Amino acid sequence: MKAVILAGGLGTRISEETHLKPKPMIEIGGKPILWHIMKLYSAHGVHDFVICCGYKGYVIKEYFANYFLHMSDVTFDMGHNQMEVHQRKAEPWRVTLIDTGEETLTGGRLKRVADYVKNEEAFCFTYGDGVADIDITREIAFHRQHGKLATVTAVQPPGRYGALQMEGDKVAGFTEKPRGDGGLISVTRQGSALR
């Protein structure tokens, strides 16, 4: 099974970080968000990834082109123009990086990578800018059991601000960042292959 990861958005709400790199490459604990997402999927047996690149996609390409360099100890012999890699650490991943355009919306990005998943019985589809505690194995099993075109995993986000409870013109109470307005946001999707 493959996982398609959207990694092409601009990241306007955290522009202080994303003027240098795409949002999925912002680091958490010294590793890009994208790496954490891929580790989660890999822990559930998904090792084949199609990354939808866009804004500053070359940063993602350079990261994977130099993956051994990032993940291993190395010795550079400058006089002999040689590099020796020590303790090679690599994930069992196959990573396909596709330029899906800078302004392309979600559906357009998925359409541009359709050829890379067309022979799959099903595939996972997720955003490259958020890490969630999701049982991917269970979600895939659920998708297969129900035989639907798509399965969506969603969460209710917390509120962004504390809230006052008012009684007339007096404050009656305060709630620290209550649950959101009841709306859900999509975290990940499993879908049947595009035809």
What function would you assign to each model-found segment?
Residues 186-195:
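Conserved nucleotide-sugar donor-binding
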Residues 62-168:
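Conserved beta-loop-beta/alpha segment of the NTase-like Rossmann-fold superfamily
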Residues 57, 110, 171, 186-187:
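A general structural signal for well-ordered alpha-helical segments in protein cores
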Residues 1-62:
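N-terminal glycine-rich phosphate-binding loop and ensuing alpha1 helix
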Residues 18, 64, 175-178:
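Short, flexible helix/strand-to-coil boundary loops that buttress conserved ligand/catalytic motifs
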Residues 167-183:
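Short, flexible, basic/aromatic active-site loop/helix in glycosyltransferases
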